[in-house]
């Protein structure tokens, strides 16, 4: 059963020598305990100094558990962030680039002209009957000088 009032203090060097997978980790996990716990022997924090009336209030300073490493540890990036260039195939044939610009073609302009029927029937008067205009396409080319 876990007793919340007492926290066991295990030296860092014991953990690092006992479990080699923790040997490369310079920052071990610290137990969750209150700083004001009367049963904790202050392994991680310095005790406060007596305060004079006009002096500044000192802050608690974190003490290092082990000697800091001389070389800063470099994290390896996750493989999903690495940019791997695609492999080039030597047997691949080169496809020539085709010019897709179209040549000049004559422009078709639709024109509308009314068509007049001149058919005269016996019952109708001699008026001209105009039907609805029909669209026809006429090819227009520029004159050559």
From Swiss-Prot:
- Can you say where in the cell this protein is located? Secreted
Instruction: Tell me which Gene Ontology terms the entry assigns under biological process.
Output: lactation; protein stabilization
InterPro entries given for it?
Answer: Casein_kappa (IPR000117)
Task: Give the stretches traversing the membrane.
Answer: none
Q: Which Pfam families does the UniProt entry name for this protein?
A: Casein_kappa
Instruction: Let me know which tissues express this protein, per UniProt.
Output: Mammary gland specific. Secreted in milk.
Gene Ontology cellular component terms for the protein in this record? extracellular space
Q: Which UniProt keywords apply?
A: Glycoprotein, Milk protein, Phosphoprotein, Secreted
Q: Which residues carry this modification: Phosphoserine?
A: 125, 142
Q: Which residues carry this modification: Phosphothreonine?
A: 121
Q: What is its main location?
A: secreted
Glycosylation positions in this chain: 91, 107, 112, 118, 125, 141
Which family would the database say this protein is a member of? Answer: Belongs to the kappa-casein family.
Q: What does this protein do?
A: Kappa-casein stabilizes micelle formation, preventing casein precipitation in milk.
Q: What is this protein called?
A: Kappa-casein
What taxonomic classification does the UniProt entry list for its organism? Eukaryota, Metazoa, Chordata, Craniata, Vertebrata
